[in-house]
Amino acid sequence: MKKYLPAALIATVTILLSAACTGAAQPSAHSQTHTPAAINAPAAIAASPAAPAGPPAHPKFESTGLNAGWTDPETGFNISNDMWNCPQAACGRQEVWANSSGDWGVVSTMAKGNTAVLVYPAVQQQFGANQPALLGNASELVSTFTEAMPTTAGTIGEAAYDIWLNDWNTEVMIWVDNQHQTFYQPLLGTATFGGQQFRIYMDHGVSHGYPSGPFFFVLQHNETHGTIDILAVFQWLERAGYLSAAKDTLTAVDFGWEICSTNGVPENFHISHYTLTVQGIQLSAVSQPSCNDRRIQRGQSRRNRRPTRAFTRIGY
């Protein structure tokens, strides 16, 4: 795998986590679908089966810096210690470490009982280097993952994809491992992609005349490893009238953890495998001059949306 991708490349790419900006946090199969339906009772929250691995003795990268980042020289993907909703009283220490874009994690300490998302350590790939990455041009967009997060009662958060469209103006999240939180926003419907059942919710933002979400696709049953057909998610949103494949563009795909609380004690979070397979749309180059601006924009977007996100927390 080459570190740099030619700007003109529009082809099939299978990648082990990438990113578009060096050393900075950024703004952040085959489907069978069901017509939007009435609200279903949430499924029971399952526990992650394996305890997360802690940091190795000598990782290639480690930092406790606010929004510190590292680019994997083999893949060009960026890993970020994204602490977008810090500093505030509930924020504690968070250390990010990495050996590769497919082997990294954080040790996070967030206040007991806090219910607002404070941090989102994640790995990212950006799209549309020289031209907009139209959703209609994508013929495949699939990701695989293996992650582990704490399951203790005081842990509040989830492992999730955070996908940005339309130059950071539209947000789609896919929750795969949810610990001790649930939604009470209106349910848009349910869907099955690749044998996985999702409940689908939406906050009511609007950008450029279109709903900007965030949209939330929440697995009915937690998975700590699996395959996610991201393109099928976009296709469901288009059929429901929320996206247009002819107009909407893909900006970035992130994967990591939204962390609200670790019960005030250090907890390990670990990703041991991740791939993103892309066909038909253009990846961004490794480095872009607008990284810092987009990091700030992402923080502003999250500050506007996340602290007011309507959750009821369970599992105390």
Residue ranges and their predicted role:
Residues 20-22, 85-92, 261, 290-292:
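Sequence contexts marking disulfide-bonded cysteines in secreted/extracellular proteins
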Residues 111-192:
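Extracellular-facing segments of soluble proteins and assemblies that are Gly/Ser/Thr-biased and enriched
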Residues 116-134, 214-246:
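Beta-sandwich interaction modules
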Residues 162-232:
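Short helix-loop boundary/capping segments
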Residues 223-315:
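Long, compositionally biased interface segments
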